[in-house]
Amino acid sequence: VSDAEGAVTKVAGVSKQDGVKNVFVRGLGDRYNATTFNGFALPSEDPEYKNISLDFFGTDIIQSVGVNKAFNAGGSSDVGGATIDIVSKELIGSGHLGFGISGGLNTQTVAADFLKQDGVNFMGFANRTEPADENSWNFRNKLDPSAQHLQINRSYSISGGKRFYVGKDKNPLSFFLTAGHTTDYQYTDEIIRNTTTSGTVYKDMNGKKYAENISQLALANVDFDMQNRHHISYNLMMIHANTQSVGDYNGKNSIFSDDYEN
């Protein structure tokens, strides 16, 4: 188990389907579930979905994950499947420093040409320079995709923290910070077929889709315990996600005309 998504699939009634974002709870998908972080609702990084991707949350930032499949007064009212609550990690002990690195590749596609869009850097940030003259602009980015010959999935992470003791009562004050970067490549052979209600086929295409997903996550935690009677904790989380894809398809697509061959 390397992230929150893998953790919740170990719970009875929770499953994951390849190619589909997030998990199913008792057969109910994204629109029926809710995701919270330390009890607070989380927005999705993708406007097409209700829930944030659980694979953003690696085990290095998770203290525990809870799955509540029953209605309760403290939960969201629009949940028919489950509420998934992610509890962030706090510093244990006097200090901590850790590094992580991982990689992977698909031996069947590593030697093949992988098509990429132009316009983003290694960190997944795009060129957002606005033209001074809207009537004339020399675009830096090319519409033609570039070919990459070695696709290596990679992930880096760093975490660290320190505990101090404040005042004559030596109340513990701890700081914890973790950050990570992930790059993931996906290649799929696709068949796309659509018909009208009368059964007329208006789209029949075969092709390949190349997708690159780049994301960063940073989490900071400050925790103060006053004489074991009062507890104050503050968490700050930042997520950046960039998804780009290139599709190369051949076949029939007659959405905008009676008979169009692509």
Question: Predicted regions: what is each one?
Answer:
Residues 45-46, 62, 132-141, 194-204, ...:
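Flexible, solvent-exposed coil segments and beta strand-coil junctions
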Residues 14, 32, 42-43, 71-75, ...:
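Short beta-strands and strand-coil junctions in structured, solvent-facing domains, enriched
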Residues 35:
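Short aromatic-centered micro-motifs
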Residues 110-115, 187-194, 245-253, 259:
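Outer-membrane beta-barrel translocator domains and adjoining extracellular loop/strand segments
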Residues 94-163, 207:
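Short strand-turn segments of transmembrane beta-barrel domains in outer membranes
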Residues 1-31, 39-73, 80:
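Periplasmic N-terminal accessory/gating domains of Gram-negative outer-membrane beta-barrel systems
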Residues 141-247:
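Transmembrane beta-barrel wall of Gram-negative outer-membrane proteins
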Residues 24, 66, 83-85, 159-161, ...:
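Outer-membrane beta-barrel architecture
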